[in-house]
Amino acid sequence: MALSRRTFSALAGSAALGLALGGSGGPGASSAFAARTVPTGPAPAPPSADGEPHTIGYDRYSLLVDGKRLVVWSGELPPFRLPSPSLWRDVLQKMRAHGYNAVSIYVAWNYHSPAPGRYDFTGVRDLDLFLRTAAETGLYVILRPGPYINAEVDGGGFPGWLTATRGRARSDDPEYLAHVDEWLTQVNRIARKHLFTQGTGTVLLYQIENEYDARVGSAGSRAYMSHLYRKVRADGIDVPLFHNDKGRNGYWTPGSFDTGSERGGWLYGFDGYPSPESTPPDWGTFGPGGAKGGASASPSTPGFVPEFGGGWFDPWGGVFFDGLGYAESRRTRDAAYERRFYLTNLANGLTLHNVYMTFGGTSWGWLPAPVVYTSYDYGAAIDEARQVTDKIAPMHQLGHLLQRVPDFAKLDRAADVRATGLKVYHLTNPDTGAHVYVARNDGDDTVTADLPTAAGDLRISVPARDAKLVAADLSLGPRKLKYASVQPSMRVTAGRQDIAVFTGPKGEMAELLVDCPDEPDVLRLDPEAAWVLDDTGLHVNAPLGQGGLIRVLVEKGERDRPLLLLLADDATAVRLFPYDTPSGTVLVYGPALLRHAEVRGSEVHLSGDIAETTSMEVWGPRGIDTLVWNGRRLPVRVTLSGSLMTTGPLPGVPEVRLPRLGGWRMRRENPEAGPGYDDSGWRTADRKTSFSTTAVPEGQPVLFADDYGFHYGDVWYRGTFDDARGIEEVALGYSTGTQGLLMAWLDGEPLGTHRMPVPDRDTVRKGTWTDTAAFPVREELRSPGRHVLSVLVRRMQHDQDGKADDGHKAARGLTAAVFTGASPKVVWRIRGEGPPDPVRGPLNNGGLHGEREGWHLPGFADRDWEPVDFPVSARYQGVTWYRTTFRLAVPGDVDASVGLTLEDDPYRAYRAQIFLNGWNLGQYINNVGPQHTFVLPNGILRTRGENTLALAVLSEFTTLSGPGTVRLSLLGRALGGTEVSVVPSPGR
């Protein structure tokens, strides 16, 4: 299969397409490239918008880019969860530096569409900018625009307005498809400008739908998938398409639905999220085979896992991680987890590998689905505050290995070998003869065993519940590695020498055997290493982590090109960064991050980050003698290994001082609860029918908020009736997401509050919660005359539609009102959020009075508000607003990540919406948790200027309410960073 723009220039389904693509569309069929053997060779150069056309092909081993094998080592990054476009570059550069060659992104329909026919791809929603930035960074893009994405976002990514439409979602319903086509037209108009096939961008693959496992065998579901396929092709998208199978079902393999006469443009992919306690599964080469065996469902396409767990989400209350939050997700799915599971995947031939998530970000505003709270940190390798964690080490080592050592792109199963106490996978490259062994320890104790290799037994140690990759007969340039007890991490050529890097845990004794037919000169450049030469070759031993990087230089002998061996423990290895320049490869050791490298004559210019005092060492093309770091020329010396090394340490990061938050002012709201409030401008809730999946109770009008155009945040109801005599109780039925809440007033007097329960393990995935709040009516309120029942509902977002049953259409808000003791005739009026903020978008605000009046915005005149000191202790039913300003003065060359931390007595029942410079950055529920610290993204946060902070505190009245302690927290700092543009934050 070879795809190019010209191949797909005609409408998908033409006879010409079928001829051009050959026949890889069904089981057993082969791609166009399969007619000839594609030998092992160097990987393609890092991608860019180079203006040159490219082909994308595949065989059963891997993708083929311009005829060269490509192992896709990708990480998920949702741009909509990082609402500061300057920071996209920061995270993308961190991914590239740490071994990723691709980024996978969902595009959320609800994020871009506030109403039918209205789409916004500007500002924080600038998809074009993200795709340009990815190309400039040198990363392929896997684009996933749905239309359904799931992703733990409101409605699974469906826009709120879709809940009030007739068509059944995720089906071939014509009304639904009309909306879908409109959405895809908008996305594809941007995507087709960034296709790798055209040389105008780096979009490599494109997903349609997601985890679509409902009614798979029906004609309607096949027609739906066929419609999406044809639509995307008709819009000019000519890269391979795929779907992400929920689990290993064998759904939507090539040939399972009609693609017209086109063949070869479809890949099979599946996802997996194994628990840390489970045994890593074999979903490919070593698996059971068949339709439900993972990659074996599509034997003619390469093994593809569009989502493999890089962490896990956490619900309100934190039941998944015992209330400890995402730190516990990161601890239980740590670097050892990654090695056990990801190495098993690679052994099974999964050469298209995307880790979900690599950076999770923040579900800001009303973006989160009911099953998650604000933070979507996920326990990922890069945390929500953009800090690289210990989990990056395996990703860094394996990513650079797969890009820099081509043998790993084409592996066949080899003869079984055994090592006591270990599960061993043995593979070999049919072209080079290299042998690869993945040794996995599923036990609770370290295992030391002899591993049979082609060069003899090799003693290896694998820590408990960990894994190790070792290689034998592996080319290191002109020389060959016979075996090594530690993992190869990369191989580069810098100037006239080859450099091979090997890594392992701190304290492990590394043993290498290098084939040396003629006696070489060996120079031990660091005292930790030892070597001996005998008839079998050069033996090198070194304890990893004893003094940092260990260098051994091998030169002369039969081979005239020197070989530099670099041995590193995990913490050291993540500070080794290769970078390809037009003048040759540069290898940098020392900084926390290398963002960019460029050779200008004899000067090598580097930019990046420093997290602590460090030295720096650079290997590069011949003739370089000057090192420039972040624009500053550094004094260097030339070492015996041929590198440039700084003569003194680079300074660490300056101190970052954060101010104490004070000067608070407060004002209470809820005028809507008062009997004299003017609601004449509100919508009358008088509809009789609804497209919701929730039945309208008999005798009741439709009270569902979505039916009246209110889709996000809080919604108010006012029910007017005459004569309250005899009323003993009012029962209010309502439907919300997780932790939904209702509070009611009669003639301005509080009746009480009702809240949905905290989810447990049995209900954690429940997306719609229904209940009835019954409030007794006090005797003094049972009077004749006009009365107003006021109700505030916090809806807590729409359910996702994972079962393709229109679950996102379940009602939100009130569903019914029933009186005991009398039956007054009630006229209901409803009001929710106002028009969408033109900058912050439709998900930023709900229907609180303060939101409509701009109390959350910078510049609002709050001088007449009451001064207040924290902590606060008050009992009140309803919303109280608190505002303050603060000024930061972070040094200009420092990238500081800042959070807002709220803490209080966990018994107190209240929640707070956090607005920074008008941006709704999350919701804190004091008595539920587990989240206490909220990331304030730079760009929205003015790190060198004034900021406005507003808290909208919703108090339940059942207990005293805060806020308690509210403070700024430093979440990370580095000297360097990227240039951050201010995110527009219009105010009053």
Give the residues covered by each predicted segment:
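N-terminal export signals
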Residues: T7-G28
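N-terminal carbohydrate-binding accessory modules
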Residues: A35-N101
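Aromatic-lined substrate-binding rim segments of carbohydrate-active enzymes
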Residues: W88-H98, S104-V153
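Aromatic- and acidic-residue-enriched segments that line the glycan-binding/catalytic groove
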Residues: G117-G123, I149-R170, G260, V371-Y373
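Active-site neighborhood of glycoside hydrolase catalytic domains
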Residues: H179-R248
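Substrate-binding cleft/loops of secretory-pathway carbohydrate-active enzymes
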Residues: A223, K246-G287, W364-L367
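Catalytic-core region of carbohydrate-active enzymes that cleave or remodel glycosidic bonds
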Residues: E277-L367
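Non-catalytic C-terminal accessory domains or segments of carbohydrate-active enzymes
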Residues: I392-L941, T948, L954-R988
